[in-house]
Amino acid sequence: EAGSAAYKAPETEMETLLSDIWQEVLGLDQIGVSDNFFTLGGDSIKGIQMASRLNQHGYKLEMKDLFQHPTIEELVSYVERTEGKQADQGPVEGEADLTPIQRWFFERNFTDKHHWNQSVMLHAKDGFDPEITEKTLHVLTVHHDALRMIYREQKPYYRGLEDASVELNVFELNGPAEDHEDRIEREADRLQSSISLETGHLLKAGLFRAEDGDHLLLAIHHLVVDGVSWRILLEDFTSVYTQLKQGDEPALPPKTHSFAEFAERIKEYANTKAFLKEADYWRELEEKEVCTQLPKDRQSGDQRMRHTRMVSFSLTPEQTEQLMTNVHEAYHTEMNDILLTALGLALKEWTGEDTIGVHLEGHGREDILDGLNITRTVGWFTSMYPMILEMKHADDLSYQLKQMKEDIRHIPNKGVGYGILRYVTAPEHKENLSFEIDPDISFNYLGQFNEMSDSGLFTRSGMPSGQSLSPDTEKPNALDIVGFIENGQMTMTFAYHSLEFHEKTIQSFSDSFKGHLLKIIDHCLAQDGPELTPSDLGDDDLTLDELDKLMEIL
C-alpha cells in the first residue's frame, strides 16, 4: 500500500479494531500496525471519521494523539474507554446560543441572509423512491437536531419533533433530456431561495425524475451545516434509505453531544484562564507588518455574488496519490503544510511581498472541551482565522516547507480560538486585540469526499443544483480558494470578483499555484529520508535554525 512500511499484522483486539476502522475510513484493503495514518492518505477530517467509528465501539481518542502517534502500534496505548454519560439521546428543543462562526454571519449583515446555503445534487440511475426518500429525510431531521433550527432576530431556536417532517418537492421531467437542464436549474434556484430563517425548514429537497435516473437536490442553510456535517448526513441518508427499502426499522449510531451543548460550553470556555493565554499569540500576529490586499486590475464598490467567476485546476490521479501519501514522508507534513507553501510561493510571485495575510478556514472540531464529543454532530462548527504566510525563504524550498510546517504547528488549537475571542470572550479580556486584520484572500482545504462513490446508492449528479448563495448577497472575500479531493483527484477552485480581477489574472495565478505545487511534490519525492523539525520533537521553544545546528553537531 502507498506510504506503508513493511506490513506488520495487528495482533491484539484493539490493534485489529483500529486496523479495521482505518481500512474503512481510508478505503484500503490492508493496513499494518506500523503504517502511518497520514502517509496512507489520512487527514484531520478522516481523523474525525475514525474517532467517530471508534466511539461507536465505546472508545475515545483525542486528535492530538493521532497527530503525535500516527501508527497503530504507537496509538493503541492512547485509546481509552469512553467514560461519563453518553450524550442525551432525546430531542433538543427551545432556545440556544450562537457559535462564533454564526455570530460572524449575523455581524456581516448579508443581503438575503435567508439564501445562504450549502447544497448537493445526487443522481441514482435506478431512481429514488419518493415515499422512502421523504421518510429518510424525516428520520434525519429527528436524529440531527440542528436541522430543526430556526433563527428569530438572530436567536437560535430548536423546534420540536412535530416539526421534523420535510416536504419532498417532486418534478416529473418529460420530453428530451437536453431540455431537462434548464428546468432543473430553474426549479433548483426556486428551492434554494425559498428557505426562511424565521419559519424554517432550513432543509429543502427536490426530486427530479427522469428516464436516465433521478436527481435529488438537498439544500441546507449554512447556519446549521458544514463540510463534516455533509459527510455525516450523506452516510446516514444512505444507511436509513437502505434500511427502509429493506423494510427494516431504521437505526442510526447514537447521537454525540448536541450543537446546542457545544455553543453553551464555548460560552463558558471563552473566559477561562487557560483559554485566554491564547490572546498573546493573536496580539503578536496583529502587530506584524503584513500585506493583506491583492493587486487588483480595477476597483469596484459592487461586491455582490452575481459578479463571482471561477477558474480551477485538477491534478492527475497519480499526482493526487503522491500528494496524499509519499510526499509527506520527507518532512512529516500534512496536506495544509504543502498547499499553503504552494499558495505562499504563488502569492509572493504575484504581489512581490514576503509577508502575506490570508483567512484560513478549518473544520473547527478541535478537542478543546473536556468530555464533549461532536464527531457525529451536524452543525456549523467552521473556524475562521488569519494567518501570515512568511515567504522570506522562497528560494530554499526545503527550508520554506519546514518553516511553513512550524508556523502552522504554532497556531493554538488550529485557530479555533480566534473566533471565540472575537465573538464570545468578554470585552475586558481582549482589550489589546483589534481583530482588524482583513485579508482579501481566503483558503479552505475541505479534504476527501468519498461518500458519493462509497454509497452504492447514488453518485454526484452533473445537473445544476441552483444558486446556493443569493446573487445579491455580498462576497466576503475578493478571492476564495477551495481545495478538495473527489474521485481520486485534487481540485483547486479560485472564486474571484470579476469587477476587480480580469480572468487572465486569476488564470495566471492558478497556473502559478499549480506549478509550485508540482515542484513541491517532485522536491519531496526526491528527498533521501525524513527530516525532523522542532514540532516533531515536541519542543515549542526550539527554532529551525537551532535544530539544524544541533543536527550538524550530531
What are these regions (language model features)?
Residues 1-114, 131, 135, 181-182, ...:
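Regions immediately C-terminal to embedded phosphopantetheine-bearing carrier domains
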Residues 30-35, 48, 52, 93-96, ...:
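Gly/Ser/Thr-rich phosphate-binding loops and adjoining beta-strand/alpha-helix segments
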Residues 26, 65-70, 79-85, 147-151, ...:
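A short N-terminal helical cap/helix-turn-helix that marks the beginning
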Residues 53-55, 90-162, 167, 177-269, ...:
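Acyl-group handoff/entry surfaces in thioester-processing enzymes
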Residues 60-64, 144, 148, 234-237, ...:
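Extended, hydrophobic beta-loop-alpha segments that form or line the acyl/peptidyl-thioester binding
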Residues 91-92, 110-117, 145-146, 188, ...:
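His-Asp-centered acyl/peptidyl-transfer active-site segments
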Residues 10-18, 129-130, 180, 184, ...:
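Hydrophobic (often cysteine-bearing) scaffold residues that line and stabilize catalytic clefts
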